[in-house]
């Protein structure tokens, strides 16, 4: 257990270091507070809990992560690098013209980005929809959603929560 904790702590440290490095490419213009605050959770999910290796990105056995609070995309990008889904040099593309690694995540399943971010309250409904599909198609993978405090008052979040409870 101690080794698993230390592994996740090391991942989180590298993710934070990488986010600071990424600031060189965007002139420091990033959503630092949110990105730094979710780093530990992402380090545990991607480093210890989720099944999301590069070999199984296309299959129903892999787990999926939806970052509903899209302004924290830089934390997601560093988690994808830590998992090996993306290479470290992709971080240099953060907020560059023509890059898929913008300030807000843009859906690109081939790169481990399951959902576009930025519109408040859309991540949980998308996650519930994915979970329903997974249940119907007998996927073994799990769906994880990270929401932000700014979106919990959105009606779509409450509708999704009620639907998730109803459909289990």
What is each stretch, according to the model?
Residues 12-29:
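N-terminal capping segment at the start of a domain
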Residues 1-15:
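N-terminal hydrophobic or amphipathic helices/low-complexity stretches enriched
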Residues 14, 33, 37:
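N-terminal glycine-rich anion-binding loops that anchor highly charged ligand groups
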Residues 7, 26, 36-167:
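Cofactor-binding active-site loop characterized by glycine-rich and histidine/acidic residues
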């Amino acid at each position: 257990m101690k080794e698993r904790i230390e592994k996740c702590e090391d991942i989180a440290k590298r993710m934070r270091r990488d986010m600071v490095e990424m600031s060189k490419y965007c002139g420091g213009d990033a959503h630092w507070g949110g990105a730094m605050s979710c780093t530990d959770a992402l380090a545990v999910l991607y480093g210890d809990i989720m099944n999301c290796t590069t070999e199984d990105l296309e299959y129903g056995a892999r787990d999926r992560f939806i970052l509903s609070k899209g302004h924290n995309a830089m934390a997601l990008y560093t988690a994808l690098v830590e998992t090996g889904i993306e290479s470290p040099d992709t971080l240099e593309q953060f907020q560059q013209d023509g890059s898929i690694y913008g300030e807000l995540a843009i859906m690109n399943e081939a790169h481990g980005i399951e959902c576009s971010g930025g519109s408040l309250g859309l991540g949980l409904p998308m996650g519930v929809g994915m979970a329903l599909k997974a249940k119907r198609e007998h996927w073994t993978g799990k769906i994880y959603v990270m929401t932000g405090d700014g979106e919990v008052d959105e009606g779509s979040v409450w509708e999704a929560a009620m639907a998730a409870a109803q459909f289990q």
